[in-house]
Amino acid sequence: SECLVGSEMCIRDRYVYQGDELGMKNVPFHDLSEFRDIESINAFHELTGAGKVAPDDMMRYLNLRGRDNARTPMQWDDTASAGFTTGTPWIKVGPDYETVNAKNEMADPDSVYNYYKKLIHLRKEKDIMVYGTYELLDPEDEALYVYTRTLGDQKLLVMCNFTKEEQEYTVPETFAGAEVLISNYPQSG
């Protein structure tokens, strides 16, 4: 999630949507009765009832694209119902609320939350992140998303590795000796 937000913070109209800043994941719904979104429920009945989509396929689709993922309770802490309510929440809480919650994220200097804070600070400090001209480098590389932003005589290099494996990349000469502004990996060398 840090890799994705790192690249997204260089988009002009970036917003943080409920739980993104904590690294909250989509909640898996295993049964149609767990959904609350009437559009999702109606689509399930309409498409599976007409035989156009198998029920298992429709559940997979709704888990990926349904709106209820964005409607689950905010995970404030590791108490019952993630600290969202002392009552019964209207929709189920994410199964990882005991570890992924605001209380834990705010206390951990290496958390997704604190990475967001650093990026937002940089975004406010460095106009190039928002207003710089975008240029994609190495569009054929399937593992790395690397691009530059240019604003006047300033240049910014953004490198995102969307794999779990370490990747080799030759940094363009213009960035030799440049300062690393932020990284979600420990610095080496």
What are these regions (language model features)?
Residues 12-23:
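Substrate-binding cleft of secreted/luminal carbohydrate-active enzymes
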Residues 1-6, 11:
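Single conserved hydrophobic/aromatic residue that forms the stacking wall/gate
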